[in-house]
């Protein structure tokens, strides 16, 4: 019944309009008795292979002139099928066999530059006219090639810090409206701005708090710590957080030395294994002797670089405090050989045993020294305590980074601490705490 109604309707329409063309593939064979075509009729969806084939056949029949009649030949109802503009764009930008989609040649670039100069009208070249002079190229291709590559006003140098700050602030206010953002960045194209945001700035910005650039105003100078961390991809989130903590600490008066508690006073702890494993006894011993385990890190007195020194010293304070809080003393100092992991056994195997001669157990500055890199400006005074029934074959290593007043990394301080017993303790059978300088 449906098939007969569709046939009668098509016959009546052909009688009224003799010039109309019956839609191709509108009626399937009688054995199936249904309208063929894709199941999805939304004009917002992608083109199907069947629609492309029908459009190609109809364009050849009408020689690409009457696009309204060409659109009527596509399958679907009047509300769901493609309109004339969609058909024209699909043919000219995708299906036209004479369309060139490859890379631009040098001759094409030179010709396009000359045509733009000839057809320039109020800084808006007529791209439809220019495309007719370039076989195989459409107006959109010519416009994008000129604005993104050939325009002499384009800035192709690396992005500066000021440009990136403007981009961050503009994106917060305008979103992904690259045309509006391009007005604030002369010489940067919309495509360049979009690519730089998605590939570089956005990824780096995700590592920082959301309110980091909320107070940035065009032309203002940002804070040096966050500025350096943002523009240096090698820095980590921990470094940026430490820098922010140092800046907050700089607002309040601080002492010129560092109070550092490195661990436990093992002399006051029972020698039994249970006392080492008990968390309550360990914490109580720490509270009772923490006042005697302080080391001082003096700040160098230099009036010229006072601000830089304060920043560097306070940053080192934070790092040393973090190391003290996470210092796992029982895993390093132990009276009995506990079952160690493979990594610990490997390190114990290749660690050089400490010499047992009299000279090696002298607590002099030559034997107990902290080495620093040549670029560091400060020396550290550090002390630790230990106890045990035999010489300890362990080494403590700490690395600290230094920055200059411009926020650049200018050195690394390395602490390598070797814990040795004193000569007098070996004779008496006791290992007493000593100061490590």
Curated annotation (Swiss-Prot):
Compartments it resides in: Nucleus
Region (Disordered): 1-46, 352-374
Disruption phenotype: Aberrant circadian rhythms.
Feature: DNA-binding region: 67-95, 127-150, 178-201
InterPro entries, alphabetized: Homeodomain-like_sf, Myb_dom, MYB_TF, SANT/Myb
Domain HTH myb-type: 39-95, 96-154, 155-205
SMART domains hit by this protein: SANT
Chief localisation class: nucleus
GO cellular component labels: nucleus
GO BP terms in the entry: regulation of circadian rhythm
Keywords: DNA-binding, Nucleus, Repeat, Transcription, Transcription regulation
One Pfam family this sequence matches: Myb_DNA-bind_6
Basic and acidic residues bias locations: 1-12, 358-369
GO molecular-function terms, A-Z: DNA-binding transcription factor activity; sequence-specific DNA binding
Keyword DNA-binding: yes
UniProt entry tagged with the keyword DNA repair: no
Role according to the record: Transcription factor that binds 5'-AACGG-3' motifs in gene promoters. Required for proper circadian rhythm.
Subunit description: Component of a DREAM-like complex which modulates a variety of developmentally regulated genes and of the mitotic genes in proliferating and differentiated cells.
PANTHER family with a match to the protein in the record: MYB PROTEIN-RELATED (PTHR45614)
Name of the protein in its database record: Transcription factor MYB3R-2
Species this protein is from: Arabidopsis thaliana (Mouse-ear cress)
Phylogenetic placement of the source organism: Eukaryota, Viridiplantae, Streptophyta, Embryophyta, Tracheophyta
